[in-house]
A protein has these predicted regions:
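A generic structural signal for short, non-catalytic loop/turn and secondary-structure boundary residues
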Residues: 1-2, 51
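Conserved PLP-enzyme active-site core in the AAT-like
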Residues: 2-5, 9-15, 41, 58, ...
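N-terminal/domain-start segments enriched in small and hydrophobic, helix-friendly residues
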Residues: 7-9, 20, 30
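Short alpha-helical interface patches
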Residues: 18-23, 158
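Conserved N-terminal alpha-helix of the aminotransferase class I/II PLP-enzyme fold
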Residues: 22-69, 91, 95
C-alpha cells in the first residue's frame, strides 16, 4: 500500500491487501448458520462501539440512507428541532423537512451549537432533536451528551448522526441518552 494514495477522508478508505483478498472469496449463504454467527459477532462488537445494550440494525446503504431511515421511522409527523452547524447537520435538516415539522436551529458553520435555542425549542414542544456528533465538513465535535440530556429532560427523542465519531471517538449512547 506504500505506492497507493492515502485518502484522509471519511470514505472511501484505503483497504489493506488482506482485506481485499478476503472480499474476493466466494460469498456465503446469508441465511446459513455461518452468516448468522458472523452477524451476531458483528452486532456484539458494534454494541461496544456504540456504547449501547439496545437493539442494533445494520443497514446496507450510505450514511445518508441511515439518517433518512432514522428520521422516517422515528420522527414522521412530529415536531423536529434540527441542530445545524455544517453540511451534514444541514442534510439532516433537509431530510427532516420531508417527514415532519422541522425547525432549523442553525449556528454558523463550524461554530458551537446554541443549546439555549435548543432548550427554548424543547420548551415550545419539540418532540425530536436531530444532531451530528462529529460535523466532518467543519471539523467540530458537538456536545452529544449535553444535547441528549436536554432532549431527555423534555421527553424528546434524540437522533444522533454518529457516522464519523463511532469507532473514532467515545460514544456512549445509553449513558448519554441518545435514542437513535
Amino acid at each position: 500500500m506504500e505506492n497507493e494514495p492515502l485518502l484522509m477522508i471519511p470514505g472511501p478508505v484505503p483497504m489493506p491487501e488482506r482485506v481485499r483478498l478476503a472480499m474476493s472469496r466466494q460469498a456465503i449463504n446469508h441465511r446459513g448458520t455461518e452468516f448468522g454467527d458472523i452477524y451476531a459477532g458483528c452486532i456484539a462488537t458494534l454494541k461496544k462501539c456504540f456504547g449501547t445494550e439496545n437493539d442494533l440494525f445494520v443497514l446496507s446503504g450510505s450514511g445518508t440512507a441511515a439518517m433518512e431511515a432514522a428520521v422516517a421511522n422515528f420522527a414522521t409527523g412530529r415536531k423536529i428541532s434540527c441542530l445545524v452547524n455544517g453540511k451534514f447537520g444541514d442534510r439532516l435538516f433537509r431530510i427532516a423537512q420531508r417527514y415532519g415539522t422541522a425547525q432549523e436551529l442553525a449556528s454558523e458553520w463550524g461554530a458551537p451549537l446554541d443549546l439555549e435555542a435548543l432548550s427554548s425549542a424543547l420548551e415550545a414542544g419539540a418532540e425530536v432533536v436531530t444532531m451530528v456528533h462529529n460535523e466532518t465538513s467543519t471539523g467540530i465535535k458537538n456536545p452529544a451528551k449535553e444535547i441528549a440530556a436536554l432532549a431527555r429532560k423534555h421527553g424528546a427523542l434524540c437522533i444522533m448522526d454518529g457516522i464519523t465519531s463511532i469507532g473514532g471517538d467515545e460514544v456512549r449512547a445509553d449513558a448519554w441518552g441518545v435514542d437513535v
